[in-house]
Amino acid sequence: MTFEPSATLRDPFVLYGESFGSRLLLGTARYPSPATLEAAVQASAPAMITVALRRQGAVGDGEGGQAFWQMLKALNVPVLPNTAGCFTAQEVITTAMMAREVFETPWIKLELIGDDYTLQPDTLNLPAVAETLLKEGFKVLPYCTEDLVLCRRLLDVGCQALMPWAAPIGTGRGAVNPHAMRVLRERLPDTPLIVDAGLGLPSHAAQVLEWGYDGVLLNTAVAQAAYPVDMARAFAQAVAAGRTAYLAGPMPEREVAQASTPVVGMPFWHADNTEQRA
């Protein structure tokens, strides 16, 4: 049975003026085998697949790198190169330029790492690097934290979409600072926000979509699952369900109980109320 997310039919996912039929982006690293990766992509039908030029060796001289790249092209899914493993502005720019030439795309997921233990982005230098890439004609999707001031600065330099983390890369903890993430969504209502790191379960993805986030990017949660293909499919369904729930308008939370079944019209309801007042 094919799962058809109805929410995407009503509100297309738009990044830099381009529409996508899915709100899930999928990484291509750490899968048990290329065949598993291929099946996971087919099962989840992502909007894009991300590729780390520095780590995958997609342009290496070896046959393995060329075979990997040919397999990705055969999937017929847009490629989003990233600058994973870059710790300086120059490394980012050099990697981005190479990726644009190799993958023949202006898209780039900007990763500028500031700490090699937490893999937290270099928030001080990130806006300047993003601005440089934008001036070079890239469509930049910056990996950032949920810090509102940083995100506004990235928008100021010209980014049209942001990729805040939910938790450090690869931790699978879900949203560790839900208050800040919800504030970010509320304060930037018109900006596409894609949760980029820290999700481990489909329920984590559904949760952030329910908050109004526009999409998620996954890698380790799928690649390191016991059954990656099934997990990829589960995440795709969770993303669609979360977005549909957001569009449906969830009921407000309440501090006290409220009966879901009305008592007006039920036998003795008036008599019971009279006795309670007596």
From Swiss-Prot:
Where in the sequence is the active site? 109
Residues recorded as binding 1-deoxy-D-xylulose 5-phosphate, renumbered to this chain, are 170, 197-198, 219-220
Key words of the record = Cytoplasm, Schiff base, Thiamine biosynthesis, Transferase
- Pathway membership of this protein? Cofactor biosynthesis; thiamine diphosphate biosynthesis
Q: Which GO terms describe its molecular function?
A: thiazole synthase activity
Question: Which segments of the protein form a coiled coil according to its record?
Answer: none
Please name the Pfam families in this protein's record: ThiG (PF05690)
The yes or no answer to whether the keyword Phosphoprotein is present is no
Q: From the UniProt record, give one GO term of the biological process aspect.
A: thiamine diphosphate biosynthetic process
Q: Name one GO cellular component term.
A: cytoplasm
- InterPro entries given for it? Aldolase_TIM, Thiazole_synthase_ThiG, ThiG
PANTHER family in the record, alphabetically?
THIAZOLE SYNTHASE
In the record, the note on similarity to other proteins reads: Belongs to the ThiG family.
Report the protein's function: Catalyzes the rearrangement of 1-deoxy-D-xylulose 5-phosphate (DXP) to produce the thiazole phosphate moiety of thiamine. Sulfur is provided by the thiocarboxylate moiety of the carrier protein ThiS. In vitro, sulfur can be provided by H(2)S.
Identify this protein by name: Thiazole synthase
Q: What's the gene?
A: thiG
